[in-house]
């Protein structure tokens, strides 16, 4: 299979008064990395633009987001150490101001302190992260420009290294929300349940799978349901979206011999996917 160089998505509204337009363009390097993504909400109507640069190890070294086709909203340049870990981020904003984020780690790489300061060396924000022996985050604390805690997250993991409990805490470290995760024997997520500090149910996600461990049904708090069908190659060919018993959308997809999506039909519009390949 040839390497994809670019993807262009053309959207055609089913409203007779609307014209087809290019809704998304994605550009790739020879390693398959997305180096640019352009999105449009209508014919010539800019929505977003992101450009990304990578080093020889396929690690991100620069990300630029745009306000419009030409004006930069934010640019981040990532400085990495010999191990490839980010130790400094230079940030440029649309008004020309800059800030710097320094990432401090202990000798065992069990903690990270991410400190962002503006060009006047004033604190903008701070993020503290603690890791377990397997390198998974077990504590994440966010601080404001006064170095005051704004919120925190505590994580627990099961014996397979999958997150089992996530707690969201407020600025006084009191519980806002506790989320539990349940998995199948194959490690697929079956249930995610969130409860507030009183133990009242906030929301849940229930997922069902077929014999190939593909998602066939997702239910969000019993209010929104997504149902999926697949072809013999495992490509999703039908997705149905429901609010209660009412179908909100039905998406049917077609693929080429390489399992690249080439068309998508929805209730209100259709999409055509066109590819350019490297020689």
Predicted regions and their residues:
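Buried hydrophobic residues that stabilize the cores of well-folded domains
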Residues: 1-279
């Amino acid at each position: 299979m040839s390497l994809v160089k670019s993807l262009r998505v053309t959207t055609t509204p089913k409203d007779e008064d609307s014209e087809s337009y290019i809704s998304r363009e994605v550009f790739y390097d020879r390693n398959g990395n997305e180096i640019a993504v352009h999105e449009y909400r209508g014919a010539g109507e800019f929505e977003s633009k992101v450009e990304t640069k990578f080093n020889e190890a396929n690690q991100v070294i620069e990300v630029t987001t745009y306000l419009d086709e030409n004006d930069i909203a934010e640019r981040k340049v990532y400085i990495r150490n010999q191990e490839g870990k980010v130790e400094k981020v230079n940030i440029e904003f649309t008004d020309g101001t800059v800030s710097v984020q320094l990432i401090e780690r202990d000798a065992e790489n069990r903690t990270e302190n991410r400190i962002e300061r503006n060009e006047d060396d004033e604190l903008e924000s701070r993020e503290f992260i603690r890791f377990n022996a397997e390198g998974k985050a077990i504590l994440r604390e966010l601080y404001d420009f006064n170095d005051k805690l704004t919120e925190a997250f505590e994580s627990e993991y099961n014996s397979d290294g999958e997150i089992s409990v996530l707690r969201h805490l407020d600025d006084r470290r009191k519980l806002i929300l506790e989320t539990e995760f349940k998995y199948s024997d194959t490690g697929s997520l079956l249930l995610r349940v969130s409860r507030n500090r009183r133990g009242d149910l906030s929301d849940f996600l229930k997922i069902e799978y077929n014999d190939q461990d593909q998602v066939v049904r997702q239910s969000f708090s019993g209010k929104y349901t997504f149902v999926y069908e697949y072809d013999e190659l495992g490509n999703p060919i039908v997705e149905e979206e429901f609010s209660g018993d009412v179908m909100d959308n039905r998406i049917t997809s077609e693929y080429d011999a390489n399992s690249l999506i080439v068309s998508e039909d929805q209730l209100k519009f259709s999409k055509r996917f066109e590819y350019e390949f490297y020689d």
